[in-house]
Amino acid sequence: NVCDGDACPDGVCRSGCTCDFNVAQRKDTCFYPQ
């Protein structure tokens, strides 16, 4: 998805994606819920 992996320091992602903590990258990133 277009927003997968986006940084979201403000907690906001583009449409359809959710901001959550990425353990591997140790930062908040956007992901598209499966």
Swiss-Prot record:
Chief site of localization: secreted
Keywords (A to Z) from UniProt? Amidation, Disulfide bond, Secreted, Toxin
Subcellular location field: Secreted
GO cellular-component term (any): extracellular region
| Superkingdom as given in the UniProt entry | Eukaryota
> GO MF annotations for this entry?
toxin activity
Residues with Glutamine amide modification: 34
Question: Which tissues and organs express this gene's product?
Answer: Expressed by the venom duct.
Disulphide-bridged cysteine pairs: 3-17, 8-19, 13-30
Has UniProt tagged this entry with the keyword Secreted?
A: yes
Comment on protein domains: The cysteine framework is IX (C-C-C-C-C-C).
The protein's name in its UniProt record: Turripeptide Pal9a
